[in-house]
Amino acid sequence: MKAAVLIWLFLMGSQARHFWQQDEPPQSPWDRVKDLATVYVDSVKDSGRDYVSQFETSTLGKQLNLKLLDNWDSLTSTVNKLREQLGPVTQEFWDNLEKETEELRQEMSKDLEEVKAQVQPYLDNFQKNWQEEMNLYSQKLEPLRTELQEGALQKLQDLQEKLSPLAEQVRDRARAHVNTLRTQLAPYSDELRQRLATRLEALKENSGASLAEYHAKASEHLSALGEKAKPALDDLRQGLLPVLESFKVSFLSALEEYTKKLSSQ
């Protein structure tokens, strides 16, 4: 089940962006996942180092003298090495998954393009109506702006009383346009869901490209990923042992020294 969900997210992540954003340069699913993971890891790494630095420069940190920053930098170096080792392995996993789902992604892309072509006139009409409303609103505001410049409105309350009906009118018109657009697009949204259901049902009936096969292939790729990542994870564990041992020794030594100072007072 998890593998099927992974495939579904992978497919939609590959294609849904192009439904509304054709002008952006294409980006592979792996690039998006890698960018997200890199930003997250770097954020955690930077914020974690800041916390360690703040503690080490505090009064208690100076008394304990744990050399946390040295240990943190060693840990960061080890983790970066792990990321470099796993890079080709995870890239191979995504390449295999992309290859296995190529046909299904092409069909989904075709469906999305067809639905987009059908709804585009409604979107264009909505944009046209909205622009007309904004132009009309601007025209109605022009006399108020002129009065304000000429000093005819002495109080801000007078201006607010004149603007409120216009603002309410624009809000009501905008709501009406949005509701109309929602009503117009509803059948196409249902059609897209139906097409997706049809594609998935076809997968179930087609022994050559069934969901069970995708599940098995995804599980196989995940298993291969785990096997190839095992040496790198073992290296990480071996690299962490000296860091943890150094931290343990420093902490116990600092604690013992701190206890002696308290006893002597």
Curated annotation (Swiss-Prot):
The gene is APOA1. Homodimer. Interacts with APOA1BP and CLU. Component of a sperm activating protein complex (SPAP), consisting of APOA1, an immunoglobulin heavy chain, an immunoglobulin light chain and albumin. Interacts with NDRG1. Interacts with SCGB3A2. Interacts with NAXE and YJEFN3. GO terms for cellular component: chylomicron; endocytic vesicle; extracellular vesicle; low-density lipoprotein particle; spherical high-density lipoprotein particle; very-low-density lipoprotein particle. The keyword Signal applies. GO terms for biological process: adrenal gland development; amyloid-beta formation; blood vessel endothelial cell migration; cellular response to lipoprotein particle stimulus; cholesterol biosynthetic process; cholesterol efflux; cholesterol homeostasis; cholesterol import. It is found in: Secreted. This is Apolipoprotein A-I. One of its GO terms (molecular function) is cholesterol binding. Sequence repeats lie at residues 66-87, 88-109, 110-120, 121-142, 143-164, 165-186, 187-208, 209-230, 231-241, 242-265. Residues 66-265 are annotated as: 10 X approximate tandem repeats. Participates in the reverse transport of cholesterol from tissues to the liver for excretion by promoting cholesterol efflux from tissues and by acting as a cofactor for the lecithin cholesterol acyltransferase (LCAT). As part of the SPAP complex, activates spermatozoa motility. Residues 1-16 form the signal peptide. Belongs to the apolipoprotein A1/A4/E family. PANTHER family: APOLIPOPROTEIN (PTHR18976), APOLIPOPROTEIN A-I (PTHR18976:SF11). Glycosylated. The modification Methionine sulfoxide is found at M108, M134. It comes from the Eukaryota.
